[in-house]
């Protein structure tokens, strides 16, 4: 949905069924689906909700991992957490919910493709989590998150060691050097930044990673290099 109208009663009921929550304040659901490019009478969009939803998701996923992987150390838990709150995972949840049918955007956003459109879908999922939290409380938000993330948490390739640690040990053994990470670009608003990080190991081609934190972007870059060099098996798309 690209026009700035509210959801139809039928669409709202269908989406609420997928979410598992009937909104007491229907406007919250509408706002969670409204991109800043959409012109609405009340001028509301999902940016503030996205800020809150990111924190609610992080808390619930951290608790899920803490309870599920009782022997995992901080490093492994961090790797799993970064995977599960990444833009890729959030966008996959958006696709599972068919949110692209309901997102309200302006004409310019309709032209977006690839990673930029993936980020929009990911942002909407975080906004939706915030709307659920504000409307129903933390337990309702947690129930939604568990519904769509618990299976992913079990499947997540977090059994791998920390990518930066693995890359450092490999580069020391093979080349006698330490990987070098640099931030090439920081973009996006303060509440939702994107970091582009490049990792370099002397003698081989560098790799880049883009994520919502510097640490997560470093992990992405390190993972890509490990997979490219055949140290790690490449993860299937969507996992």
From Swiss-Prot:
Catalytic residues in the record: 54, 126
A Pfam family this chain is assigned to: dsrm
Gene source species: Rhizobium leguminosarum bv. trifolii (strain WSM2304)
Its biological purpose: Digests double-stranded RNA. Involved in the processing of primary rRNA transcript to yield the immediate precursors to the large and small rRNAs (23S and 16S). Processes some mRNAs, and tRNAs when they are encoded in the rRNA operon. Processes pre-crRNA and tracrRNA of type II CRISPR loci if present in the organism.
Subcellular location: Cytoplasm
Broad class of enzyme this protein falls into: hydrolase
Full protein name: Ribonuclease 3
UniProt GO BP: mRNA processing; regulation of gene expression; rRNA processing; tRNA processing
Name of the gene this protein is made from: rnc
UniProt GO MF annotations: double-stranded RNA binding; metal ion binding; ribonuclease III activity; rRNA binding
NCBIfam families associated with the record: RNaseIII
Gene Ontology CC terms, in alphabetical order: cytoplasm
Gene3D superfamilies for this protein: 3.30.160.20, Ribonuclease III domain
Cofactor(s) needed for function: Mg(2+)
